[in-house]
């Protein structure tokens, strides 16, 4: 039986026009046993979920779309089981995330843009013991699947050795993977898709999983936009998560439908009075509130997250991180100089390194550093680089940084390059995966790679979930106050949402859409009109 015949037997039409790609009716064969339908005896899939599993079994590329709480993760887990049932012994050599070691595993992968999203997918999929044993290392980031690695080259323009990361998997060294499912595919930009597409063998099945209502990539459209106008679409329409007993999920759907949000114990809007203050005053008020909530147990830094539309400004995630760290951690603060950047961090700080959350476990002098001497570490040094109280200078340690001397004339050009790339300290971290890293180079501690993680931008938070989300929404954030951002922020919360901002800003965000259209059909038509002249292929 061909896949077209199989799909026809299930009542699934293969579309010719974008508006026909969305599943409208599914006919499930009543003769199929529960096990055959779901590949799991304790889960019963609905019609839309069953459609997705049958498409996966048929080897057909398609899009799996669903709003918050519609069972995408459950469906994804059953899809993986279906895919494994037809592998016929085909395998691929995967690189293990973090260690670089190689492992042979079935020739299918579930990939995400970030490590955090990949970790969440891995935890969800591998709740099933069978999948944990067979598929653990198959759930990874796109970059790791493509085996990105540093390559050194001579930059003629800069007249020096340089380094960049490039994928080791490409058209000349392709992936021997039969099926690739892309989780949170709305986050994947076209450049990264090009690299992945280049490394795929002809005929590779690709399943695009995502929520079209979330934020698109920072730069340009996502590959999901293109997939939606080229491939069959299965839209999950039944809400399961929390069964609407929480205002978090109720309001997430209210936001999508352009309705006013409801307030209650698990969804609060704190306006802070009638007057609209500037960012500086609002930040001081927020810091005071966060400290009180922390002391009362309402704010738990290990379980909760503070989100902001921006990373810069007094109410950006960088500033919020500094304020929160100031009252959370009273240990010695170190001024770490990393190129032109100065960080003020302490042992125990919650951090994010390359989009993965962890903790600082040690900070020590970097003997390779030969730059400007940083301030001595002290519990009186603030997170903004200001000494709050007079310290006994004789008691302060200088970490030996003042005593580093090098015979520069005797050093090779390579050694000089290595020397200039060093940070003032070695920052040792432990990631949530248990991976231990020692960050000593300025690039490793750059703003792109390293930050405190009490607060994040909404973009960086995609693919993650916390107990409580505290969203800061100020009038100065108006340029980014749109429906997709508010929806993305709200759906990061499992239990409670607290919006710190004026209600008119919430209303503005609900009413403003970056992606035109209320329904999936209208959004697909919008994408089709805007992408008609492109030559991006998803199959």
Stretches with model-predicted labels:
Residues 26-33, 39, 50-70, 76-79, ...:
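Conserved helicase motor core of P-loop NTPases
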Residues 4-5, 9-33, 468-539:
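Helicase C-terminal subdomain and adjacent C-terminal extension
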Residues 353-500:
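Conserved helicase C-terminal RecA-like lobe
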Residues 176-179, 203-207, 496-497:
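Loop/turn-to-beta-strand initiation segments
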Residues 183-184, 210:
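Walker B catalytic acidic pair
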Residues 184-196, 215-222, 481:
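Conserved ATPase-coupling elements of RecA-like P-loop NTPase cores
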Residues 173, 198-202, 491-493:
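Short, conserved loop/helix-junction motifs that constitute active-site signature segments
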Residues 107-176, 456:
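Inter-Walker segment of RecA-like/P-loop motor cores
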